[in-house]
Amino acid sequence: MAREIVLDTETTGLDPRTGHRLIEIACIELEDLLPTGRSFHRYMHPDREIDPDAQRVHGISLAFLADKPRFNHPDVAEAFLEFVGDSPLVAHNAPFDRGFINHELERAKLAPLHEARWIDTLPLAQKRFPGMHNSLDALCKRYKISLADREKHGALIDTRLLAAVYLELRGGRERGLDLTVKAQRGTEAVIAAVAYGPRPRPLAPRSTDAERAAHAEFIGGVLKDKAIWRRFGV
């Protein structure tokens, strides 16, 4: 099965080259485009102020991050790298997320994530919907993906939304449904094998000798040739 990681980040501002930092990162694991239920999510203290414009977007305050670890903590940087492994990384406007993540990895003296690993859903959307607005919100509305659970932008909820959008961009729910049906058919085959296989011990008769004799008398004496199964030579 093809494993991919959908991810999103929140930051203190727009550009790591001017000193801005990561404050949240979230990932969801996909197998053949469908979420497996495995995820990674961390908040990080940035050691700097958060720009007011950025805070209005994601709602994360420095006070909230006061007790959160730095990115270079093993439970953040190393755990993140272990989770993503060598799988392709899916992001919306990937250069933004890649720039911040690689900036943090380099600060932690860890190898950056190569550009070739990244799948950017923004150009995919622009190719499918040329000349249209292709933000994550716009794509969710276009594909009728509910935004009801999201009050502000956040890495975890945005990653879940992006996973649904990515499925649509790669062929839609029909493809996901086909995969689900295949899995269901496989399960049904196992159930059928169990249901119709030979019993290790035959069931004991559930009718008495007297009941079986009365049934035979009814069939032979009352129904005779009127029994419906006689029409089929049974």
Roles of regions detected by a PLM:
Residues 76-79, 165, 218:
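A ubiquitous structural signal for well-ordered alpha-helices
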Residues 130, 153-156, 205-209:
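Short, well-ordered coil↔helix boundary/capping segments
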Residues 1-116, 126-130, 138-152:
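Conserved non-catalytic scaffold segment of RNase H-like nuclease domains
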Residues 187-234:
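Acidic, Ser/Thr-rich low-complexity intrinsically disordered segments
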Residues 88-91, 95, 100, 104-105, ...:
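Acidic, Mg2+-coordinating catalytic module of metal-dependent nucleases/exonucleases
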